[in-house]
Amino acid sequence: LIRFLRFVSLLFGCALILVSLTADLTGLSVGSGFSRNQWLILCMGLFAIIGGILGAAFAKLYRRTAIMLLNLLILLVVLDISALVVVKLIDADRFRLRQRKLDAGGVHLLHDNVVERYVPFVLWRAVPDTVMAGATTDGEGFRITPPSTVRSDGDTLYLYAFGGSAMWGYGVDDTCTIAFYLQQELASGLERPVRVSNRAQCAQASTQELIELLLQLRAGNVPDIVLFYDGFNDVASAYESGIAGAHLGLRSIEGRIEGDPRAMGRIPLAEDVFRRTNFFLFLGSIGLVSSEANPLPPESYMDHGVSLDSLADDVVSIYLGNTTVATKLSEAYGFAVYFVLQPNIWCGSKPLSACELGFRNGSAAGAFQPGEDENWRNLIRRCYLVWADSISNQGRIFDYSDAFDTCEYPVYTDGCGAHITAAGNRMIAARLADDIMPEDSLEYSENSSPSD
C-alpha cells in the first residue's frame, strides 16, 4: 500500500507540473507568460513528488518544517508589534497619516498631510469635514476661512478664491492663509461684511479651477468677485507630461485608465504584504525605504521631445484662453474676475536665505524633485517671461513674481518653491486687496448670497 501511495503521489505531482507548464497552450491560463497560479500549481506538483520520493520519512520532514515555520511566524509577529511601538514613539505622524488614508478610502495623497478624494471633472478635492494639522475642510472638501459664520445679507461681499496649494494654505493654519488675510483686508477697507470662500485645492491647475467655477455657477453659487491665483501648477504639469494644459499626475491617472499595472498599484503579492506591515513603516521612518509602491519613473518634457520655447508658449496660451473664458463668464453672470501669477522661488529677485537656496537648487531635504533639474528652472522662468509680455496690456491679470524682491527674511517654507509663510501670505493678501479693492464699497452688490 505504501508503494502504491508513493507511486500515486509521484504521478499526481508530475501531472500538476505538466498542467502548469502547458496552461497557456491548453487554454487554462487567460494571460500570457507564467502566472501566479501556474507557479502555485508547479510548487504543489514538486511538493507531491518530494512526498512520493521520501515516503514514510516525509512525515518527519513535514513535522520538523512545520515547527520551524511556526517559530518563524511567531518571531515575525513579535518583530512587527515591536516595530509598531517604535514607530509610534519616533514617528507618530507617519502612522496617523496612513490611518487617515485608510479611513478616507486610501486613494490619493498629493501632499504629505493632505488626503484627497476623487471628484468628477475636477479630479480631486480634499477629504470633507477633516482637521489636518491646523487645516480644516468643510462638507465639500474646501478649506474653511474663519470665522465660518459671517452675516449673510444683501450687504455682504462674496469672493471665491481659486488656486493650488499656495492659495489653499499648505503648511499654515486656517487663520494664516491668503484667503483669511484677504477677508480681513477687504472688510477693513470696505467697511462692510466680506466673505472670502477658499475654493483652492492642492495641486490643481487653472483649467481644473475653471471647471470648478463652472460647477459652482451651475449650482447657483454666484459670487461678487472671483480670484484665480496660479502659475506654478500650470508649469509643473507641463514639465512632467510635456503637455500644456494638462493636470498634475497625468501619467498615473492615464495609466490607471489604460491598465498600466504600475499606475494601478499592482505589485507582487509578497511586496504588497510587506508594505502593509508595521516593520515597513519603521523602515520608512528611518529612511531606508520609500513609501511609494513601485513608482513610475520620473519624466520631464525633454523625455517627450518637446522644446522649451514651444511648451512655454503653449502653457501661456492655454492659461490666457482660460482667462478669456472666465472673463466671458463674469460678463454673463455679473461678477468681477481677477487673475494673479503667483510668486515662486525661481522667479523674481528675492534675496534668498541659505535654506531657500537649498529649496531653489533642489539640494535641501524634501525639496521639489525637479528643482535640481535645469530644464525645470528654464521652463518656469521662460513661462513667466512670456506671461509678462502677454499680460502687459491686460488690467485684471497681475504678475506677483516680484512680490518678495525686497523681503530680506525667509518666506518660502519648503522645497515646493511656492508655499510661503504666514507673513508672506499676509503680504500677498495686502497687495491683492490694493489691486482688487473696488472704489465704491457697494460696487459689487447685485448677486444673491452664494452657498459657503
Tell where the protein language model's regions lie, with residue ranges.
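Membrane/wall-proximal cationic-aromatic binding patches
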Residues: 91-185, 189-190, 404-408, 452
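Catalytic cores of nucleotide-enabled group-transfer and carboxylate-activating enzymes in metabolic
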Residues: 55, 59, 178, 182, ...
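Serine-dependent acyl-ester chemistry module
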Residues: 13-27, 233-389, 405-410
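Histidine-centered active-site loop/cap adjacent to the catalytic His
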Residues: 2-3, 319, 391-396, 412-452
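Membrane-interfacial loop-to-transmembrane alpha-helix junctions, especially the N-terminal start
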Residues: 2-13, 62-68
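Membrane-embedded alpha-helical segments of integral membrane proteins
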Residues: 8-55
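Conserved SGNH/GDSL esterase-like catalytic core that processes O-acyl groups on lipids
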Residues: 130, 158-160, 166-269
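Internal/C-terminal transmembrane anchor helices
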Residues: 61-87
